[in-house]
Regions:
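Flexible helix-coil transition and linker loops at the boundaries of alpha-helical arrays
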Residues: 60-63, 95-99
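N-terminal export/targeting signal detector
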Residues: 10, 21-24
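Bacterial N-terminal signal peptides that target proteins for export
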Residues: 2-10
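Gram-negative and organellar
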Residues: 24-60, 68, 76-82, 86-93, ...
Length: 492
């Protein structure tokens, strides 16, 4: 949003206000993280399709396995079926030395051991070799289809499960395959949420009401500086964040990420001569691009377009390109990094309060899930905004940390909080403002809801956002803002 510097010795000055741009970036990231978390929570249900680790026992007794085909063949199957992974390497090594052994069984065993250890490339290589050696073995076909499923190769998995069924499987295994098909249907659908809410904002124009007299004479102020007063307003807001993946072949996918959110404020600017009359906003983003996805990695290249509406007019149209890589280190740890470049082009009306510029951004993220209902996440972002005017160009870095926790119980209570600290410095001294601008901003976002209190499938959610911006030019850019909203959200 714009700020206006007013003084009798200066007719007008249009200021490019970075905090409003930062606010949109923060809201976009918060919604994207929320959508990603929803997908990860659904993926946790898929883990129930795999048996947990066990111990090396059979019917309560421990057996010594001699080096014979008659003993090692069933021992390998028992070790696999009961997750006796510590003993499996010894069994397979001795089994391979025996004449007349089945190479496919040894490769299947080594594949499942590699899967247990998290080495999916080796697991797939060994299982595909086993399938080539015994193309009609139902167990090999089933395990290969499961590996393809876990590696996000849905088309291959679907074909693999069909071949396994044709090879003949017990009824309980057929029911398990049906569960895999249901899981693939869920994967192929839309994920995300839509929300509608009402609330209150105590400073929609990010103002501070600063006043000072620059020159007195004989008790009369001849030169004064007066900034706008904060405008309070009730509001209506909405959010829509969706994601869908189309498996093309193997690990290659087409990914869609549409997103839109906005706020309507009941109050407008009381000054009819002000450049900014209506602070209501709407942001829409569409990302369409390529994604490589396997059991451990997600690599995406996403061109996108962004449209911003405010002051009752189209404000700007931006287009950009995002490259993102995320790596799952273990069941608990995930890291990621991203590069983003974007070009903002303002409309004729938008140029009253802004100017065209380029933004380049690098980000680093990490998340830790100590338990299935708790997630800690953090990130660091470096940004560069380049205008034609050096005084308006800036560099900034931002650090954020967040916590999500779902409480046990019928109410389904959950809380999601994020804190952001941002430090921004402009490139050059501005003689109109009298200094080289530097801002330090804090943003706190807290949302809490109850999945057990749904009304017509809608979850009630309370959200509070508080922003504090300190500047060496505090009279122009310093402000505090608090927004509270009650939303009803539908998860997809």
């Amino acid at each position: 949003m714009p700020c206006r510097f007013r003084a009798v010795w200066l007719l007008s000055l249009a200021c490019l206000v970075a905090p409003a741009i930062w606010a949109d970036d923060d809201d976009t990231r918060f919604l994207q993280d929320q959508t990603r978390r929803s997908i990860e929570q659904k993926a946790q249900a898929e883990e129930a399709l795999a048996a947990p680790p066990g111990t090396l026992m059979y019917e309560g007794r421990r057996y010594q396995v001699p080096s014979t085909l008659e003993a090692l063949t069933p021992a390998i199957y028992v070790a696999i079926n009961t997750n006796q992974w510590r003993q499996l390497p010894d069994f397979v090594a001795r089994y391979r030395e025996l004449p007349g052994h089945r190479p496919a069984l040894a490769n299947m065993a080594e594949s499942l051991l590699a899967r247990f250890e998290g080495n999916y490339p080796l697991a797939l290589q060994r299982m595909e070799l086993a399938s080539e050696q015994e193309p009609t073995d139902a167990r090999v076909l089933l395990e290969l289809a499961r590996l393809w499923f876990e590696d996000h190769q849905e088309k291959r998995a679907e074909q693999g499960f069909a071949r396994a069924l044709d090879a003949g499987l017990p009824l309980e295994v057929q029911m398990l395959i049906q569960q895999y098909h249901q899981a693939m249907d869920i994967r192929a659908g839309w994920h995300g949420s839509a929300a509608l809410g009402v609330g209150y904002n105590d400073n929609i124009n990010q103002a501070n009401g600063y006043y000072s007299c620059l020159n007195y004479f004989a008790g009369i102020c001849f030169f004064e500086r007066q900034m706008p007063d904060p405008i309070e307003s009730e509001l209506v807001s909405y959010e829509l964040s969706l994601q869908r993946r189309y498996n093309l072949s193997g690990n290659h996918n087409l990914q869609l990420r549409p997103m839109s959110y906005g706020t309507y404020y009941a109050e407008t600017n009381p000054s009819r001569t002000a450049t900014m009359q209506d602070y209501s906003t709407n942001l829409a983003i569409l990302q369409v691009g390529y994604q490589y996805l396997d059991a451990r990695n997600s690599i995406s290249l996403m061109p996108y377009a962004e449209h911003y509406y405010r002051n009752r007019a189209s404000d700007y149209l931006a287009h950009g390109l995002q490259l993102e890589w995320r790596r799952t280190l273990s069941r608990k740890w995930q890291i990621g990094t991203s590069l983003d470049t974007k070009r903002y082009e303002y409309t004729s009306k938008g140029q009253r309060t802004g100017a065209d510029y380029e933004m380049h951004q690098w980000g680093l993220t990490a998340s830790f899930m100590p338990q299935p209902n708790t997630s800690l996440y953090t990130g660091l972002t470096l940004s560069r905004r380049k205008y034609e005017i050096e005084q308006a160009s800036s560099k900034d870095w931002a650090a954020r940390v967040g916590l999500y926790h779902a409480f046990p119980g019928r109410a389904g209570l959950f809380v999601n909080g994020m804190g952001i600290y941002r430090d921004s410095r402009n490139d050059a001294h501005d003689f109109f403002l009298g200094d080289r601008r530097r801002d330090r901003q804090q943003v706190y976002i807290l949302s809490a809801g109850a999945n057990g209190w749904k009304v017509a499938g809608l979850t009630p959610e309370l959200r509070v956002r508080h922003s504090i911006n300190h500047s060496n030019l505090d009279w122009a850019f310093g402000f505090e803002q608090t927004e509270v909203s009650l939303m009803l959200r539908r998860q997809f």
